[in-house]
């Protein structure tokens, strides 16, 4: 009997152990289930709150409320751990842009300034977008002109006259395809003489100011958005925008441009205030330790921008301050040099296109600044520089400038001449592994220096339009650039309008073109889209 009880007891103990083990297994399974359910609930809750947070941020930006701080449910940890802002920004309107890219390029101009001895200048109709290729000439070879004398006008808008940048003799009228006019070249006088003006009265109306600017030849320095056209004098702009700093690769320091001329710049801003019922906005550089000299300007709304290129583009600033559009949302833009031109005209009664030009890029022996006038001959402008053999000269910056020869001329709106080596040398196994330092937004190619000797090599050829997020990494604008470009290619007007074509000009997409893995000519595509929209009225 006892022998029977012993195995029976063992059996009961085993059964109890198995039962306990199964209960513990069920309990463990329940814990896993409840844990997964709780995790799923937390993820769902986070998604809902994140979507609500994003909607709040988007709506606050549309309402113009998100000037400095992030108006959402969550704090912006990038701002929390970012470097401390300088004291001058504490009470200012500041836009911190987290997207963009500063190309690490050598050839930054040193702050030394010399007077360029240039004898030939030109005004080029192609510098003014929207102008008919064959404008009506008012001069011919051999004519003598003063600075400010009209040399041609647009047949479509005959009230807008384009003036000679210097006084001297017209020595050539260069024509291009289909008899289009490429350049009107002037041999400058040693002693410059400006056309005399009868300035409007201090209390002149807006209409009188507009007529004076049209007659003086200064009107073409005002550009209109959308499309970056020469401003239409029959349109009253909602606002006027001026960017006072340049973030393009090895670009000029515009603080040097106004050194000793702040009174002239202030006079120009005073004129702009009388041309719009809205506001004059100045985009200021908020990246430095000390405040911008433009902060002292009165009569204008000041907005600071911090971030990588293209933070200095006026189009990016318009997008964040008050986006432009057609009709009542038309705005005007000017550069610092153009504001100075207006200031000289109204303060001293002379047409003066004097500007500082940055001679920059790794191909120049001594990157620096030269003082000259608009349309200067590039060969004379860079005289004294040793140019690296097999280099490309660009009027403007490397992203949106135009290739020129030494016989070419500085663009009317350009304040920079860049030279970099041609990238026409084969790189051994370049398709497999970059053996030389190169600029790239990709983290797979580490950039170990801020002074890379960049060439024109694009490291690839045009290929199928690949969809990725490269554009979004460098575009600090709420615009779907890939979809916009594709809508332009297929000529979908409604999609082009809805996707933001009115807010962009070629310089705004130049950095995206640099980052494009498909090597698409985005600036050219955008300009084609502008042509289509203008043709459709």
Briefly describe each language-model feature range.
Residues 133, 139, 156-159, 366:
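Short, solvent-exposed loop/turn positions at domain surfaces
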Residues 51-138, 305:
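N-terminal, Lys/Arg-enriched amphipathic/low-complexity engagement segments
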Residues 1-23:
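N-terminal secretory/membrane targeting signals
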Residues 159-167:
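Short coil-to-beta-strand transition motifs
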Residues 139-153, 171-172:
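Short, well-structured beta-strand-loop connectors
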Residues 23-70, 160, 174-537:
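Buried, small/hydrophobic-residue-enriched core segments of structured protein domains
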Residues 133, 164, 180:
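Exposed loop/turn and edge beta-strand positions of beta-sandwich/beta-sheet ligand-binding modules
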């Amino acid at each position: 009997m006892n022998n029977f009880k012993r195995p029976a007891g063992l059996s009961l103990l085993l059964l109890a152990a198995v039962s306990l083990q199964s209960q513990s297994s069920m309990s463990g399974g329940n814990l896993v289930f409840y844990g997964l359910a709780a995790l799923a609930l937390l993820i769902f809750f986070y998604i809902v709150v994140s979507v609500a947070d994003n909607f709040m941020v988007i709506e606050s930006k549309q309402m113009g409320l998100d000037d400095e701080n992030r108006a959402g449910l969550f704090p912006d940890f990038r701002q929390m751990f970012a470097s401390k802002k300088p004291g001058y920004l504490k009470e200012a309107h500041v836009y911190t842009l987290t997207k963009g890219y500063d190309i690490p390029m050598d050839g930054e101009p040193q702050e030394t300034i010399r007077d360029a001895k240039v004898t030939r200048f030109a005004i080029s109709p192609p510098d003014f977008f929207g102008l008919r290729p064959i404008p009506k000439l008012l001069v011919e070879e051999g004519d003598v002109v003063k600075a400010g004398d009209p040399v041609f006008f647009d047949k479509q808008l005959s009230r807008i006259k384009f003036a000679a940048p210097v006084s001297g003799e017209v020595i050539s009228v260069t024509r291009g395809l289909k008899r289009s006019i490429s350049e009107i070249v002037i041999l400058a006088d040693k002693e410059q003489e400006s056309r005399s003006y009868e300035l409007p009265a201090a209390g002149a109306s807006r209409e009188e100011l507009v007529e004076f600017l049209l007659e003086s030849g200064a009107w073409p320095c005002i550009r209109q958005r959308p499309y970056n056209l020469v401003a239409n004098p029959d349109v009253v702009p909602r606002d006027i925008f001026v960017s006072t700093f340049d973030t393009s690769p090895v670009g000029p320091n515009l603080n040097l441009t106004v050194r000793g001329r702040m009174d002239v710049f202030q006079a120009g801003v005073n004129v702009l205030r009388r041309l719009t019922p809205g506001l004059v906005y100045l985009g200021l550089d908020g990246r430095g330790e000390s405040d911008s000299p433009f902060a002292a300007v009165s009569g204008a709304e000041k907005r600071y921008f911090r971030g990588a290129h293209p933070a200095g583009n006026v189009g990016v600033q318009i997008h964040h301050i008050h986006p432009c559009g057609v009709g009542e949302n038309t705005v005007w833009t000017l550069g610092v040099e153009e504001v100075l031109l207006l200031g000289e005209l109204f303060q001293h009664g002379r047409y003066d296109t004097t500007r500082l030009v940055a001679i920059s890029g790794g191909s120049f022996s001594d990157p620096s600044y030269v003082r000259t006038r608009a349309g200067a001959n590039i060969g004379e402008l860079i005289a004294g520089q040793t140019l690296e053999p097999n280099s490309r000269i660009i009027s403007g910056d490397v992203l949106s400038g135009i290739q020129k020869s030494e016989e070419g001329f500085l663009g009317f709106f350009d304040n920079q001449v860049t030279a970099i080596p041609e990238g026409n040398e084969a790189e051994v196994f370049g398709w497999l592994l970059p053996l030389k330092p190169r600029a790239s937004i990709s983290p797979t190619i580490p950039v170990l220096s801020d002074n890379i000797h960049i060439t024109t090599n694009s490291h690839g050829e045009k290929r199928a339009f690949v969809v990725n997020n490269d554009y979004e990494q460098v575009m600090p604008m709420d615009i779907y650039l890939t979809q916009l470009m594709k809508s332009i290619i297929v000529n979908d007007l409604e999609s082009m309008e809805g996707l933001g074509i009115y807010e962009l000009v070629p310089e705004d997409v130049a950095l995206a073109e640099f980052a494009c893995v498909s090597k698409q000519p985005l600036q050219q595509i955008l300009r084609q889209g502008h042509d289509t929209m203008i043709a459709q009225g």
